[in-house]
Amino acid sequence: MCVLGKCIIAKRLLHLNGLSGVNEFVYVSWHGSSQDIVGHVEVRTLVIPAAGLGTRFLPATKAVPKELMPIGDTPAIQLVIDEALGAGIDHIVIVGSSAKPALEQYFAARPDLERMLRAKGNDAMADRLASIGRDWRVSIVHQEDPKGLGHAVGCASSVVDGDAFVVSLPDEIMGGSRFLQKMIDVCTTTSGSVVGLMEVDRSEVLAYGVVAPEAEMVDGVVKVGDLVEKPAIDEAPSSLIIIGRYVLTVDIFEEIAQLTPGAAGELQLTDAIRAQAQRSPLHGVETMVNRWDTGTPAGFLTAAVEMALLGDGVEGLGSDLRDIVERHRS
């Protein structure tokens, strides 16, 4: 099936169901096999919502998308992609914007740059650049009129493969692929959607979606009876918040198409998942790996420092950082 054709059809369907803010679906690049993946039940696609303007990082984000800002020497979005690749994903969908062309440039091949690096003897970096998108596909769709996370995920409906897919928020960096792999395994076992969870102090729940467990948690997995977006502290059903990792069955798009504005006047993904849970199982998996929230400059700096010290995705910088700290102690 023509990918562009799929985009046009999806655009029309979403428009008829009230998502008129979707201006276009643009398939920018394709790496690897040119065949659509059909007939597979595996979770193969990652959707990354990346259309936001990154206003907390202005003026830097006026020119450089926040998702491309480096943690060590690796763009934040690449760390999110690497996590998914380690869990078996091979199709990356970026929900971007025409105002952020640098995202498209990052995924575009640069054979001229690779040749220059090899001529200078830097084969390691040339190989690293060549590997971006070499063994996985990249689709880029545009969300020109952002109306919330539910709306952003809906924009990807035209290019999602398979029966279920992953959504990863690029503001949240995880320490490895084990957590996401476990979420995918639970989705495969239950044939239902799965949300990532983390327990927090009850005073923090008002900033997140919060789940109401339907049973006791076993081995980090719990059946979810209900969920609420940004509840008041005294109305929160638990202290288990939803973090930026989801594994969703594709019928979530039916619920997204029916969304009306919720919290903050936006189309909330939480509301779509809640509606889906009325007719299919929903589970949560509590994270067992490090998690960094890079949504603020302070959080971004914390992630860069801690990941360097721990060696999580930031190779070779830990010793340099320790030397800097020691110099300033004296």
PLM feature segments, named:
Residues 166, 180, 184, 188, ...:
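Catalytic-core segments of class I nucleotidyltransferases/pyrophosphorylases
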Residues 45, 90-92, 137, 192-193, ...:
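Residues at the starts of beta-strands that form the adenosine-phosphate
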Residues 103-105, 113-116, 123-214, 257-258:
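Conserved beta-loop-beta/alpha segment of the NTase-like Rossmann-fold superfamily
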